[in-house]
Regions:
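Catalytic NTP-binding/metal-coordinating core of nucleotidyl cyclase/transferase enzymes
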Residues: 1-43, 50
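Residue-level signature of catalytic and energy-coupling elements of molecular machines
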Residues: 11, 27, 67, 90, ...
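Active-site phosphate-binding and catalytic loops of NTP-dependent enzymes
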Residues: 52-59
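A short glycine-enriched loop-to-beta-strand structural element that forms part of the catalytic core
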Residues: 60-73
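Catalytic-core segments of nucleotide cyclases and related cyclic-nucleotide turnover enzymes
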Residues: 74-95
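Cytosolic regulatory/linker segments at or just downstream of nucleotide-handling modules
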Residues: 96-141
């Protein structure tokens, strides 16, 4: 449980510092929202790096993250809808230490120079194929 608390603490600090908001924690995952896609991308990278520096005994966690831009429906403090499902499917498609983003996020953030197309796939509960991109940090230019 200490590792989960540490991961949540790191994630919350970075998300807030980048102008995002934690919507909820889902077991060992977190759902956050951002107004700015570039800030979401930067936060995603920062969280992945920060979490990989945490250790519990000999264990070093490897986070995976997924981003999607859309118009989810706000219900109280939560968000619902197809775009939330897309974001979850994009995150699930990421490998350890990887940040994936949907085509909508890459386009909205103008981040195509930091993205490499990975694949297109159909996901349950989503009416269209999802195109995902691996996103590399800005400092890797």
């Amino acid at each position: 449980l200490q590792l989960l608390r540490d991961v949540n603490g790191v994630t919350e600090n970075i998300v807030r510092s980048r102008g995002g908001r934690i919507v909820k924690h889902l077991g060992d995952g977190t759902m956050a929202v951002f107004i700015d896609g570039v800030e979401a991308i930067e936060a995603g990278h920062e969280v992945i790096v920060a979490v990989s520096a945490l250790t519990v005994g000999d264990y070093r966690p490897q986070l995976r993250a997924g981003l999607h831009t859309g118009e989810p429906r706000a219900v109280g403090d939560d968000f619902l809808g197809v775009d939330v499902n897309v974001a979850a499917r994009v995150a699930a498609a990421a490998g350890a230490g990887e940040l994936l983003a949907s085509g909508a996020t890459i386009e909205a953030a103008g981040a195509d120079r930091y993205a490499t197309r990975r694949r297109r796939f159909r996901a349950k509960g989503v009416p269209r194929d999802i195109e995902v991109f691996a996103v590399v940090p800005r400092y890797s230019d």
